[in-house]
Amino acid sequence: MARGLGAPHWVAVGLLTWATLGLLVAELGGHDDLHDDLQEDFHGHSHRHSHEDFHHGHSHAHGHGHTHESIWHGHTHGHDHGHSHGDLHHGHSHGHSHESLYHRGHGHDNEHSRGGYGESGAPGIKQDLDAVTLWAYALGATVLISAAPFFVLFLIPVESNSPRHRSLLQILLSFASGGLLGDAFLHLIPHALEPHSHHTLEQPGHGHSHSGQGPILSVGLWVLSGIVAFLVVEKFVRHVKGGHGHSHGHGHAHSHTHGSHGHGRQECSTKEKQSSEEEEKETRGVQKRRGGSTVPKDGPVRPQNAEEEKRGLDLRVSGYLNLAADLAHNFTDGLAIGASFRGGRGLGILTTMTVLLHEVPHEVGDFAILVQSGCSKKQAMRLQLLTAVGALAGTACALLTEGGAVGSEIAGGAGPGWVLPFTAGGFIYVATVSVLPELLREASPLQSLLEVLGLLGGVVMMVLIAHLE
């Protein structure tokens, strides 16, 4: 009993601890960005200013009344009428502010942006670590972000989906839904849109309605594709695993409903879950002991049990779908870490801390979804540990790619154009279809308030982490 009463206090202490750590990293990030700005000025500014002077001087040398057949205007899409100087100046000033914004918000984009101005600055930065040390740092950081949340889960006093843990589990589920939605709308989708929006801004002479809407529209389509794909997978799994039992559970023999129950248990079944279900629903225990011999007594409760089994199967499928989305998300995190360590040790450490702060609340939410899906605490932790394979694969991919080009694009939010928005669609589907409906169950006013606060807490956590990135 004392342990149950202390559970919300542990959750509150954990959230406050991570919020404090986030503020500390924010201060560290600001200081590190200032240092990187100074380093950027020292290493690359002279080259870029000379480049700017060359462009600017060339425009003045040809005069304001000149035609636009000069070699520089040919480089800027060859317009027919005379605003070469304005176009070039505007393009360069935008490029400068674009780099400043990226340098403040994404430390791991330094390598990519410097490469755009010339390769002279990049090799000096990339040789900060030799090959063996680079792999050791990057893989070690990836293991850290995968193992740290794993140990945090030991502090959560939830063993299974049982009545005595139900209130705390519901709060964790609300936190998970807020984290999933915040991650999708504040992290994945904005990062997927960034390279496309910058591409359109770098070409001010073109119409925004044609060249700008295409890539942005593709991001939205990939988000919808993720939602539809997860829907199709869930319907397929439900049809294969429980469709027969559910379709006949209401009107046929008791053995059909019972068979559906047996199928659902094969995925995540433990003695703890079995005992908790017997504790929670006496009618199910009566069915197991009597084997359906007393039809009149079991008849009235059969539709309710079929509905409960359908809900349980839906939750189990959604738990595994969430793991699939988390695997893809961890792959992009691994790419970001690998690319950042190619840019330097300090940059890699800062990126690792940011990803770690992002992963801990995310993994807590995934843990709650798996437990709600019927897994025990140990099973949920093992399944989450498997998602570390995606992070390790992403890190290795970023390190093996020549020059870290793919890793740099992923770290800056572009990556393969479909990965981030497709993953965001998966997170949106799991949060809205599987998790949020669980929060609509009847509860006391205090419990409902705590669930709403938990959802807002997950969103606020992602807002803080978005500022760090």
Curated annotation (Swiss-Prot):
Location in or out of the cell = Endoplasmic reticulum membrane; Golgi apparatus, cis-Golgi network membrane
Q: What is its main location?
A: endoplasmic reticulum
- Give all Phosphoserine modified positions: 275-276
Question: Can you tell me where the transmembrane regions are?
Answer: 10-30, 138-158, 169-189, 214-234, 386-406, 410-430, 448-468
Q: Which InterPro entries does this UniProt record tie to the protein? A: ZIP (IPR003689)
Q: Which family is this sequence assigned to?
A: Belongs to the ZIP transporter (TC 2.A.5) family. KE4/Catsup subfamily.
Q: Where is the composition biased (Basic and acidic residues)?
A: 42-56, 66-114, 264-285
Organism expressing this protein natively: Pongo abelii
Cite the PANTHER family for this sequence: ZINC TRANSPORTER SLC39A7, ZINC TRANSPORTER SLC39A7 HISTIDINE-RICH MEMBRANE PROTEIN KE4
Q: Could you mention a single GO BP entry for this protein? A: skin epidermis development
Q: What would be an example GO MF term here? A: zinc ion transmembrane transporter activity
The ranges of region (Disordered) come to 42-121, 242-310
Q: What does this protein do?
A: Transports Zn(2+) from the endoplasmic reticulum (ER)/Golgi apparatus to the cytosol, playing an essential role in the regulation of cytosolic zinc levels. Acts as a gatekeeper of zinc release from intracellular stores, requiring post-translational activation by phosphorylation, resulting in activation of multiple downstream pathways leading to cell growth and proliferation. Has an essential role in B cell development and is required for proper B cell receptor signaling.
Q: How does it sit in the membrane?
A: Multi-pass membrane protein
Name the record gives this protein: Zinc transporter SLC39A7
Question: Which residues are recorded as modified (Pros-methylhistidine)?
Answer: 66
- Describe the subunit structure: Homodimer.
Any one cellular component term from GO for this entry? endoplasmic reticulum membrane
Give the free-text PTM comment from the record: Methylation at some His residue by METTL9 leads to reduced zinc-binding. Rapidly phosphorylated by CK2 following Zn(2+) treatment. This phosphorylation is required for efficient cytosolic Zn(2+) release.
Reactions that this protein is recorded to catalyse: Zn(2+)(in) = Zn(2+)(out)
